[in-house]
Curated annotation (Swiss-Prot):
Keywords: ATP-binding, Cell cycle, Cell division, Cell shape, Cell wall biogenesis/degradation, Cytoplasm, Ligase, Nucleotide-binding, Peptidoglycan synthesis. ATP binds at residues 123-129. Pathway: Cell wall biogenesis; peptidoglycan biosynthesis. Pfam families: Mur_ligase (PF01225), Mur_ligase_C (PF02875), Mur_ligase_M (PF08245). This is UDP-N-acetylmuramate--L-alanine ligase. One of its GO terms (molecular function) is UDP-N-acetylmuramate-L-alanine ligase activity. GO terms for cellular component: cytoplasm.
Amino acid sequence: MAYYSTVLKRKVRKMLAVHFIAIGGIGMSGLARILQSKGYRVSGSDLKETELTKKLRAEGITVFIGHREENLASDVSLVVVSTAVSQDNPELLKAKRLGIPVMHRGELLARLMQEKKGIAVAGTHGKTTTSSMIAYVLEKEGFDPVIAVGGEIVDLGYNAKAGQGEYMVAEADESDGSFLKLLPYAAVITNIEADHLDYYQSFEEIKKAFKKFADNIRPEGFGVFCWDNLQVREMLKGYKKRKFTYGFSPGSDFMLRDYREEQNQLVANIYYKNTLEGELRLKVPGKHNILNAAAATAVLRNIGLSFKAISERLLEFNGAKRRFQILGERNGALIVDDYAHHPTEVEATLRAAKLYKDRDVLVVFQPHRYTRTHFFYKEFARVLVDAEKVVLTGIYSAGEKPIPGVSGEMIAEEMKKLGKNPLYLESLDEVYNYLEQNLKPGLLVLLLGAGNINQVGYKLLGKA
């Protein structure tokens, strides 16, 4: 690790060629784009062709499909990997054999952040939207930030950019502990809940990791923390660094009041230390997004933006891809895609769908990862019983090996115990055929999951 750090401290500009193994992920592709914009010759490989790999290729990045030794050119100066890359990957083995430095994507993100005033957004839920809000406002207000977030910002058309300004906005990924490599100027924690228990083993370990992340804020910087979340509140006991809290709860520094829904907009007044800042209005649905907007406001006010500028830009904001993204309409049915893959996220997205009072909601949920399904199948069932109609699919493995006895049917069986009778369709082809026969005016089809369930929506709309 020390050697990799030394290599990057010499300014990556001196290294002409960088190769990304598993370049097709949203985080890895973003870093690849940033390095390419900085003047590096970038290549990468992934297991399968996707819209993202096609885009990277169109942007001039060499992308190989499949992992093979010959994908790694002999003049490559640095290889970047994600946690998903196995130790027996042929490109990784070749890099080690040739003595080419290998760096985890989290380390690369940390090194890029050292060059800027980093704004890192962490949390079990809400980090993509919150970081996208901050990035969007800074970009539109002329700050030209470096951007590395976990979803394409709809209004900007990208999730990563090598800006020339003083700030860098990044999503801080806790799933593999790599967010602890970051030393941000400003950090946000939106919430702390149990997730990624395959990596952390216990909720206590997750809480310790978030505490360390908060402790890693630079001495001259500040933290922004959600006061509504009890685990965050517990973490802040004895916390010494400069901090600001936000939320609906009394005692929040940036406090939301008078939440309401008006003409397809979410509205709340926001106060700082009991003094009215003004009114926040959003087009993106879901009460949780007002909380995300409050976090963004707290960060942006503390780096000098006026509330007027912030509120006007947040009203323009149309969200990030796969975050309650309206894909289109067919046969009068509205098709919406959302990345929700944790019970709390599913619950929040179902609440957001209730804003469409004139539509019946049909939820199609694709569980993500065997481990997550194993740990949370009862919680998924509990939140899904509130939906009008539910279709469950097979598990999207995300590269995990199957766990005997763990399947999407576990959620279906648990829902039946709670009085709901969902439809279980193992394959996405079955889901597509079912939806094609059942689309009708007044229906809202909500495709939920962090896997490839959105491809069903695109196929229904003739976009696949």
